[in-house]
Amino acid sequence: MDQSLSFQPLLFGGDINVYSVARAFHEAYGVRSVAFGKYPSFPCHSSAIIDYRVCPDNESDEAFLRNARAVAEEFADKTVLLLGCGDSYVQLAARHRDHLPENVIAP
């Protein structure tokens, strides 16, 4: 990963949508995205361009906030760009937008 980047992509989901977004970030910026999905599923699991983390309760409010906060702390020196790659994750991001750490933005 290019350490000079000022942002870190954080993706929620585990399907081809997540892989496509991660691939776009990787091709444009050389960055490896962090992604949380419910299952160790293809094509995200074991991808070289995604730090894929399995979270069985990924769609719960508690897990969403816990995972967002953990990545915000892990990348405290960067702006974490949180993207939901599915309707349920977009809803979680919208619902908890005001409860995310300062270095996390959810457009």
What are these regions (language model features)?
Residues M1-P107:
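ATP-binding N-terminal substructure of ATP-dependent carboxylate-amine bond-forming enzymes
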